[in-house]
Amino acid sequence: MSEQHAQGADAVTDLNNELKTRREKLASLREQGIPFPNDFRRDHTSDQLHADFDAKENEELEALNIEVSVAGRMMTRRIMGKASFVTLQDVGGRIQLYVARDDLPEGVYNEQFKKWDLGDILGAKGKLFKTKTGELSIHCTELRLLTKALRPLPDKFHGLQDQEARYRQRYLDLISNDESRNTFKVRSQIMAGIRQFMVGRGFMEVETPMMQVIPGGAAARPFITHHNALDLDMYLRIAPELYLKRLVVGGFERVFEINRNFRNEGISVRHNPEFTMMELYMAYADYKDLIELTESLFRTLAQDILGKTEVPYGDEVFDFGKPFEKLTMREAIKKYRPETDMADLDNFDSAKAIAESIGIKVEKSWGLGRIVTEIFEEVAEAHLIQPTFITEYPAEVSPLARRNDVNPEITDRFEFFIGGREIGNGFSELNDAEDQAQRFQDQVNAKEAGDDEAMFYDEDYVTALEHGLPPTAGLGIGIDRMVMLFTNSHTIRDVILFPAMRPVK
């Protein structure tokens, strides 16, 4: 047996022995009739204590004689004979406990406390003081075991190092990784901040179906499920767009939804099949109004959550404080491929030749607009590091967007890029029912030609448009990618609590 295999076998043996010992301790607690008590109540969390009392000197704390109760997980313990120091971790952070044998009821220190394990959940009561090193601590007068942990924590110095284990056992990642905990706190703050921002601008939050008879609102491959009661195949939604615009037809002039979308596509550092989007629709507005709204939203979130408008990300710093750059799609192609003759982007054969020269395989179903879009994605997208709006998307790749009044081959649409990736997509909505019907038919033709991401024909949505959709603008923002930016995370799995994973066999 190799040394590595021997070490692995020893580790398994050690773990099995520890599991056995911990279960024996739980059995003893069961015999005492109190394995999982539920009558302990705390009055503070660790962050509240630090915020209120870190600035006070020990003499002041002694004079105030403040008694508190806390609860959390025992992360470290230093036993020094008749006294010990414990680090207790709760939702707000960590607080130190000073546990002395003679300050607890008889037998608690030696017969109970010393037999507890790291990872156990404790309740503690006592008075605040500061150690000689100035650390805020609780001098315990009561200490109780609230939950016995049957499995040990990850190594306290190295945490959960295996990346896949972090995703599969997110609970361990959250216990042992301060950075991971902070990421999801920031995510929650972003969600709350978006809602506050939207409501402040007069939008109403709504919910639309997650299971749909016809998936629409985006070009993507859907998941298929079956409704037993209706004996009907249905699709998990790829976007809420068409339902939200039905609500605008119905008279709700400003609506938004934050919820999950599902796309049966690949997994990467930027893509998870199940992801969170915020979509909004605003009557009597156009895409330019949404550009202003998007800038304001990101600037507000950065200032409110991070306290600044400059957001560090890897080697870059995104500046949300200054006006975002705005380029048309063709301007972006020219900027990042200077040799491009702009006239070639107006000719199918010339554009196809450019695409093929940079390694793009042009499909038979593609028209000029799709080819130009593919060229943009290949030569320009990765260079859009600072916040940038790209406008004038071809109508061919924008089946739900309003055509431009001057050039009907393009639409009043933008996509929003930061760090070389798309974060949001917005446009003036197509409200011409006949034009929409024709574009749906074009999508059907593309699907029949082999494009499995082309949209379905949604007759009911066309009927809704025939009742009259006011001039409207719509915007979708990927929440997961937004959180990545605000938390300096470089894979989408780091900002989704439970990302899609292949089951362990």
Curated annotation (Swiss-Prot):
Q: Where mainly located? A: cytoplasm
What reaction does this enzyme carry out catalytically? tRNA(Lys) + L-lysine + ATP = L-lysyl-tRNA(Lys) + AMP + diphosphate
Top EC class, one word? ligase
Q: Which residues bind Mg(2+) 2?
A: 422
Which keywords are on file for this protein? Aminoacyl-tRNA synthetase, ATP-binding, Cytoplasm, Ligase, Magnesium, Metal-binding, Nucleotide-binding, Protein biosynthesis
Binding residues for Mg(2+) 1, per the UniProt record?
A: 415, 422
- Please verify whether the record's keywords include rRNA-binding: no
A single GO molecular function term of this UniProt record: ATP binding
Q: What does this protein need as cofactor?
A: Mg(2+)
On subunit structure and binding partners, the annotation says: Homodimer.
Q: What family, per the record?
A: Belongs to the class-II aminoacyl-tRNA synthetase family.
Protein name, per record: Lysine--tRNA ligase
Native species: Citrobacter koseri (strain ATCC BAA-895 / CDC 4225-83 / SGSC4696)
